[in-house]
């Protein structure tokens, strides 16, 4: 095992649930404002998951007051408190960039049975 792999192995989180593109998730993010720390929930659809190991990231998209908001999180970040899976999506693509152009009911993802 390489030295960097050993360092990476110690930084990996073991409480990350199995989720993928199309799933609707609640990401509980630790936000530090001054001396206070609070948890902010970001709920949306996972557009992609890329990378591997410590460098693995995922992108979540949501509509907020008619404006699309995307946020990319490192999977093993210490700033993420935890991730809840709201629903599983039934999609055939690994990257759901086409959802950026869709509005309303067309942007809805079928739920996996």
UniProtKB/Swiss-Prot annotation:
It comes from the Bacteria. The lineage of its organism: Bacteria, Bacillati, Actinomycetota, Actinomycetes, Mycobacteriales. Signal peptide: none annotated. GO terms for biological process: translation. Belongs to the bacterial ribosomal protein bL19 family. The gene is rplS. PANTHER family: LARGE RIBOSOMAL SUBUNIT PROTEIN BL19M, RIBOSOMAL PROTEIN L19. Keywords: Ribonucleoprotein, Ribosomal protein. One of its GO terms (molecular function) is structural constituent of ribosome. Pfam families: Ribosomal_L19. It comes from Mycolicibacterium vanbaalenii (strain DSM 7251 / JCM 13017 / BCRC 16820 / KCTC 9966 / NRRL B-24157 / PYR-1). This is Large ribosomal subunit protein bL19.
């Amino acid at each position: 095992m390489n030295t960097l792999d050993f360092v990476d192995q110690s930084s990996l989180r073991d409480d990350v649930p199995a989720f993928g593109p199309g799933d609707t998730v609640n990401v509980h993010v630790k936000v530090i404002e001054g001396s206070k720390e609070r948890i902010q929930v970001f709920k949306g659809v996972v557009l992609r998951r890329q990378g591997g190991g410590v460098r693995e990231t995922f992108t979540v998209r949501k509509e907020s007051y008619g404006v699309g908001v995307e946020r990319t999180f490192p999977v093993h970040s210490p700033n993420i408190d935890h991730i809840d899976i709201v629903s599983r999506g039934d999609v055939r693509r690994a990257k759901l960039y086409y959802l950026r152009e869709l509005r309303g009911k067309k942007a809805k993802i079928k739920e996996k049975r």
